[in-house]
Structure formats: structure tokens, C-alpha cells
């Protein structure tokens, strides 16, 4: 294998603001670490002229070269520009290069979660269906965040390709008490209300600090809890999170259990593992399975009583036991391991 590959992304690597934009760069860096020579297409699709120019240059590179496979990290929504569909057809049908694509989201399939209505929804759904038709015609394998999500789609060759961990250097936590970190939205579906109500109840029986990282505009949703002595609020991202994580010895994912949450796999799960934090999570199917399979924490129902019971049971000693398994899970689920999985495309 020459280790020459094509990599198509829809982000600007200099503007990484969300999980969907961070992931393509992590994959890219892991490919480089594994010794791959990458012909790369980047650029935001809403910058149409720039995208078409980049696609033309990418096409010229493909014409001249030989490549083992092509990997695609698509946008969160549908593909806007026809040049990208044409590239996939050219790579697959003319150059005969095997293509694998990561299909990140299925919001558009589910009315309860999909916020668009009326003609906008019809147009976006039509675009998603057109994308899927092109994918079925051009791709040898489709990767999904989880197996459960993959089961919703009809495709012969499919695999789960969840986010990865970073091999960060982490100091051993010396907390004498349980201190929890939560990074994310505080809306009800993401478990904000459940988390705050439960921690308030716990703190009537024993001290337990919550380090909560959220956006500034969400502070109003914290209501009566924002001034509680057990709650520390931060607005941090990127490297700023390291200091917050260092304060905690336990992480939490308190999502409301529903059909969509059952098949999603949050990036934060693997970020928590990267910082070697055991995890308490509600019983959303794929998250719960990962935690239980790796024995890296506790799983509860999405109600106050169940979460309260788990938090009352947890202590520094069993956190240290879970921490040993977290370190193993971290090594087994790096971005480099994800890239090794993708590299099997060359054998198809």
C-alpha cells in the first residue's frame, strides 16, 4: 500500500468551533501520524466560489495521481454544491478509488427532533435524500457514529466509527471528595434540569461540587440554582477546559432518554475519557453500552431518584477503581485507532 489517500472535508481547519468541525482535523492529524500522504480538500460549503475553486484543484490532483482510498467527512447538513457530488462520482466511477464516508447525523429522519418546518424542511429533506442516493452509488463503506444509527440505514458495508480519545498527559487527581464536571447544554433534553435538581438533593445529604461548563447565554436557564454554593459555572472551550477538568474526578452525561439520544454518541464522552474521568450517564443505549462494556462508570435511569441513588453510592475509592479502566479505554479508542479502521478501505 502506497499510503497515498484522498481526504474530503467541508471545514476550514483554522475555524474549529464545534464537534463536527473538530473531528475532521483530528482524523487528519491521525492520518499524518500513521504516515499517510494526504491530498486534501477543505473549505466551507457556504463559501461557494471558494469551494468550487478548491474542488477544481482537487480534481486536477486526482487526475495525476494514484490513491489507495478516499475518506469523506461530510457537513452536518446536506451537501450544497454539485461539485462535491461530481467529485464523488469521478473518484468512484472513473478513477475506481474506494470511498468511505462518515454519515454523522440523522436529524432529518425524525420529526420530533427536526426543527425545520414547511417548505424549508421539504427542500432540506430532498437534498439529504439526493446525498444518500449519491452515497449509495459511489461509496464502498459508510461509517456511522454508532451501530444503532447504522441500523437505520440500508447499506451493505457499514461500521460504527465513533469519536476518538486524545492521549493527553493527565495528573492523578487527589480530591478527597467527589467533584463532578459537566460540559454541554443545559436544556431539558440534554439533562440540565435533571442534573441540577439531583445535585441539589444530594447536597442536602452530603457535599458534592458540580463544575458546570456552558455558554454564557445559557446561564439564565440555571434559574434558582446558579447561586448555589455547590455549583461552579464556567464558560470555557478548547485548552481552557483543561483547568476545569483538573478540578473534577468524575464526569456526567445526564441526557434525557429518547429514540434519538439512544443512537447518538457524544464527543464529550471521549473527551471525558481523554482526561481520564470515570463517567455517570443516563441509560441512553449506545452511551450506556460503551460505559458498561468498558466498566468505566455507572449508568442510571433519567430520573432524580435513580441518579440520586448512584451519586450517593459513588465515592473516591470506587472512582479510583473505575479510573484504571478509563485509562485502558483511552488507549483503545484513540483517533489513531479510528484511522487504522478507516485504512481497511484499501482492502475492499
Indicate residue ranges for each PLM-predicted region.
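A charged, aromatic-enriched C-terminal amphipathic alpha-helix characteristic of glycosyltransferases
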Residues: 19, 302-304, 315-347
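Conserved catalytic-core segment of nucleotide-activated headgroup transferases in glycan assembly
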Residues: 23-27, 166-168, 176-223, 234-241
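Short N-terminal targeting/anchoring amphipathic segment
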Residues: 60-85, 96-100, 141
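Active-site proximal beta-strand in glycosyltransferases
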Residues: 69-70, 90-112
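Membrane-proximal helix-turn-helix segments that form the acceptor-binding/catalytic region
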Residues: 86-94, 109, 118-142
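Donor nucleotide-sugar binding/catalytic pocket of nucleotide-sugar-dependent glycosyltransferases
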Residues: 124, 129-171, 182
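Nucleotide-sugar-dependent
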Residues: 190, 241-244, 251-271, 281-289
Amino acid at each position: 500500500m502506497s499510503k497515498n489517500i484522498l481526504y474530503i472535508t467541508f471545514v476550514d481547519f483554522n475555524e474549529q468551533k464545534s464537534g463536527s468541525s473538530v473531528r475532521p482535523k483530528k482524523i487528519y492529524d491521525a492520518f499524518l501520524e500513521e504516515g499517510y500522504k494526504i491530498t486534501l480538500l477543505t473549505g466551507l460549503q457556504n463559501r461557494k466560489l471558494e469551494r468550487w475553486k478548491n474542488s477544481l484543484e482537487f480534481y486536477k490532483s486526482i487526475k495525476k495521481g494514484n490513491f489507495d482510498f478516499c475518506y469523506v467527512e461530510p457537513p452536518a447538513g446536506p451537501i450544497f454544491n454539485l461539485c462535491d457530488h461530481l467529485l464523488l462520482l469521478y473518484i468512484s466511477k472513473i478513477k475506481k478509488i474506494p470511498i468511505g464516508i462518515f454519515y454523522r447525523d440523522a436529524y432529518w429522519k425524525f420529526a420530533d427532533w427536526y426543527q425545520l418546518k414547511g417548505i424549508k424542511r421539504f427542500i432540506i429533506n430532498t437534498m439529504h435524500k439526493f446525498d444518500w442516493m449519491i452515497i449509495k452509488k459511489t461509496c464502498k463503506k459508510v461509517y456511522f457514529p454508532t451501530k444503532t444509527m447504522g441500523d437505520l440505514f440500508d447499506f451493505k458495508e457499514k461500521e460504527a466509527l465513533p469519536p476518538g480519545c486524545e492521549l493527553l498527559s493527565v495528573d492523578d487527581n487527589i480530591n478527597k471528595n467527589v467533584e463532578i464536571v459537566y460540559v454541554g447544554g443545559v436544556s431539558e433534553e440534554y439533562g440540565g434540569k435533571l442534573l441540577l435538581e439531583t445535585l441539589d438533593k444530594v447536597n442536602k445529604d452530603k457535599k458534592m461540587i458540580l463544575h458546570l461548563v456552558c455558554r454564557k447565554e445559557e446561564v439564565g436557564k440555571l434559574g434558582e440554582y446558579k447561586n448555589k454554593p455547590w455549583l461552579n459555572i464556567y464558560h470555557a472551550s478548547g485548552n481552557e477546559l483543561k483547568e476545569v477538568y483538573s478540578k473534577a474526578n468524575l464526569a456526567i452525561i445526564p441526557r434525557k432518554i429518547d429514540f434519538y439520544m439512544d443512537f447518538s454518541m457524544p464527543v464529550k464522552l471521549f473527551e471525558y475519557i481523554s482526561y481520564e474521568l470515570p463517567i455517570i450517564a443516563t441509560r441512553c443505549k449506545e452511551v450506556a453500552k460503551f460505559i458498561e462494556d468498558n466498566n468505566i462508570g455507572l449508568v442510571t435511569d433519567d430520573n432524580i431518584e435513580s441518579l440520586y441513588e448512584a451519586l450517593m453510592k459513588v465515592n473516591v475509592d470506587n472512582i479510583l477503581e473505575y479510573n484504571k479502566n478509563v485509562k485502558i479505554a483511552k488507549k483503545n479508542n484513540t483517533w489513531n485507532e479510528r484511522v487504522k479502521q478507516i485504512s481497511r478501505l484499501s482492502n475492499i
